[in-house]
Amino acid sequence: SIPLFALAWSSLAVSAPIKPQKISEAMVYTLPGKTYEQVREDLTAAIEERGMVISAVSHVKDMIDRTSTDLGYKQGIYATGGETVLFCKADLSQAMMRDNVHNIALCPYGISVYTLAAEPNKVFVSYRIPPKLKVYQPIHRLLDDIVQSVAE
């Protein structure tokens, strides 16, 4: 006979963390089985649930679409989204800037959500990672934690 608590635990779905790819200076995650709208909504919730405030949303896709033909490009890059959500966490930002006042350029943090024109059914989430800054490691962990919660 299997104990009741074992049955309860076995019915819980535990998802493994998704693994990002490091592409250039960005960590890029592919979130299968989710729509852009779901991911964008979940990202907002994940940031706010951690007590942070979104300071701005950069509409990168709109700028790319608006300027493509003027620059000689025939096709856009992004199918939907193409937004970067900007926010900070006071304690981590304080530590980063007290380590080096010029780290102000690394704040706010940004997480981008988008689908590609070439792959409209895949939702991507990405963020920048500065090269080898020890003081940025807690921020990197925070950003990964946020994306992992969005992926669940």
Predicted regions, residues:
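Terminal, regulation- and interaction-focused segments at domain boundaries
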Residues: S15-G51, A56-S58, D65
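Beta-strand/loop substructures that line and gate deep hydrophobic ligand-binding cavities in soluble
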Residues: L106-K132
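N-terminal signal peptide c-region/cleavage motif recognized by signal peptidases
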Residues: A8-S10, S15
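Bacterial N-terminal signal peptides that target proteins for export
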Residues: S1-I2
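Compact, glycine-rich, soluble single-domain proteins
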Residues: S55-L106
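C-terminal partner/receptor-binding element of secreted or periplasmic proteins
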Residues: F124-E152
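A mature extracytoplasmic/lumenal domain signature
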Residues: L43, S58, K89-D91, A117, ...
